[in-house]
Amino acid sequence: MGRLLGQAALIVLLAAPALAAPRDTMSLDTGWQVRLDPADAGAIKAHPREARWLPASVPGSVQQDLIAAHRVPDPFIGTNEGAIQWVGLSDWQFRTSLTVTSAMLARDHLDLVFDGLDTFATVRVNGTVLLTGDNAHRRWRADAKALLKPGANEVLVTIASPIRHLQPMVLAEKNPLPGEYDSAFGDEPKGKQTSPYIRKPKYQYGWDWGPRIVTIGLWRPARLEAWDDARLDRFRVAQEALTDTEARLTAHATVVADRAEAVTIRAIVTTPDGRTLTAERQASVAAGRNDVSVPLSITQPQRWQPVGYGAQPLYTVAATLAAKGEVVDQARRQIGLRTVTLDRKDGAFGFVVNGTPIFAKGANLIPFDSFPARVTAQTMQSLLTAARDVNMNMIRVWGGGYYLDDSFYEMADRMGLMVWQDFMFGGAVTPPDAAFRENVRVEADEQVARLGDHPSIVIWTGNNEVLSGWENWSDRKAYKKAIGPDGQERIGTGMAVLFDRVLRGAVTANSPGTPYMPGSPSSDYEGPVDTDANGDRHFWDVWSGSKPVENYLDSCPRFMSEYGFQSMPAMATIRGFAGKGPLAADSAVMKAHQKFLAGEGNARLQFYIDQRLRPAKDFADFVYLTQVNQAQAIDLAARHHRACRPVTMGSLYWQLNDVWPSISWASVDYDGRWKLLHYAARRFFAAQAIVAEHKDGATRVTLVSDATTPTPARWRLTVRDMAGAVLSTREEAATLAPLSAATVATLPDATLFGDAAPAQSYAVAELFVGDRRVSRVLVDRLAPKDMALPDPGIVTTWSGDSVTLTARNLARDVMLDVGAFTGGQPSDNGFDLLPGESVTVRLPAAARKTLTIRTLAR
């Protein structure tokens, strides 16, 4: 524990340029080699070539190294996943040479720092053990000075197979803890998973959207840090109070010192418009860890706002640590000033930012890649930009992966995207022992301290589906029966302590202005979990439960944090992993890249096509129809959630992205190509939207506005037949109240459609602000397959990198399918065209050769 300092001198003055110099740091990210651990005789016998050293990447994984050396095939291609499984079942060694000078050895400390060891690692320096690690989510540091010598030094990191390391213990358990997904490769017996017992990204053990690639390696940067006297171990900035006239902050510095001495902490604040303020505190520190705080005050603060509600001004807070009159360390934070609360009154679940109730619109983010070390800033930037560009304002970082790099949250800060941050628990029941909780406590304390200053993070949640699974899932109920009342009490109490005390305590200590919930879904122990009445919901009756998509209309949850519907990725993405041969949904390669129901999920795609749409003409048309089904399902659900405001205050669909090229719930596939769902999100998440729901023989029209001021508008409902004739029109003026959803009409079929045949007629609901149509949706009384859709008669006209589509008749769900073209994607897609209507889409002219126009017409 740190030592909290008492009274100390506080000096506030006009800032001068910071003269801080960082501690000396030497990167250890180059020169690494990897081989099988000589002690792993079985692996060496099976793979003798890998007993010799080969080049390794840090940050990275041994799987990446073997792929680069062509020792194993790329698991993302074809059916290669099985061929890489032996790697995660073997023990490995990594080594590098570290050159140390006499000047370096003259420093007080030479710390080896590993930002990520994956996972059961032993670090030796010149043959002597320096440290052992057992948590991939933690940073590991140890002073290596006593083991180093002038000249070349060997750093050797031995990492055990996480599965084999834990398997003897798990196999000896009469009732092992329930995990997530059983292995499809026979390396773990069914129901005897090792993943619940390890602190490592859980998705790497396989999920219903991703492969089983149990990575091993130094997955984040490594370095040597030289320092004297004292160093800054942590630096964060807490917001104590915020008004329109003043922001009161506290800069918290954790100082690690060799001995008792006087130090000076200086904090320099740079405002968004370039003004500076400096505060300085002199204090006496003791040997060990010390907490030093520096109060700060900012007048006329500029508030950070979520996208769509204002700007995102950011402040820079730089800190220097001086000892013996010399600057010995420095740190820097970028912060935003905002208040956030979670409205929980009477079971509600809604975010209030700077006093404004925000309807959360967005999606769930899974890890960017099976190999996190190769994720680039550009990849993250592109995906977050894609989210913002379709009117999302929130991203949920799902709990089965890893805590993302600082750059991700910095991007979210700049874009105004709110982040829902799970702690990294993906669904498995957690061990009840105190040692496991202590390991997690250190992890959580470190991660919240690292990330807690980001204004984009508006909630921390303790886990994904651990608590709801414990309460509701059939396999958990069977487990509880097997272990009896005493076992249930022991396991249940352990989870309650972990999620309600340990993790909540980490947030309270390091980010006290950010709400916390013990899980998702959660009612915060106020009652049953995963209900419409209290807390957030994960709704999977549609898709996983094979229920009709219209079931989305049956309830108004308080916050829908998960719901989803699968589709195929783009044809170009499919060709990338399946090759040039014939394609079929039930082929080995397509089933290998479909993880739902162990590869049988493609039958679920066909089930919903049969239920709702026309038959596919060929495989490419099948791909199109799956994307139409996905877009229509999520459009229906998201608009319904928005129409349920203020009962419902958020809609986050599953999922935004893919971890590998696959058939999944993603709206943006692994190669960054937008599915029709992502284009649809731009429409159903628009700031002002019209919702027209047909249910029980009537159409309900609701107008939705996210604006903070009243908006004059008008809405129109037009009934047409398939020949294009207008059968009736209703139009009314309306004022959209701020932050609202208002039902303006409920019209029985006889009133709206008269005697028009359901298969031969449809309604067009439109919302106008001024002369601009801001939202449109079509209303059918039958499933699309039962509508008498005419030949749309679409004509295309090219002009440079733009193509204009003109429809002679109604065209539903128009897709510009560019096939195998990889040079760009349409600016819009998946839209409807009314008779005689034209739309111009930006698309590289080179796509003309492969372009196919698809619609729902037979």
Protein language model annotation of sequence segments:
Residues M394-R414, M418-A592, N629, A633, ...:
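Substrate-binding/catalytic cleft of secreted carbohydrate-active enzymes
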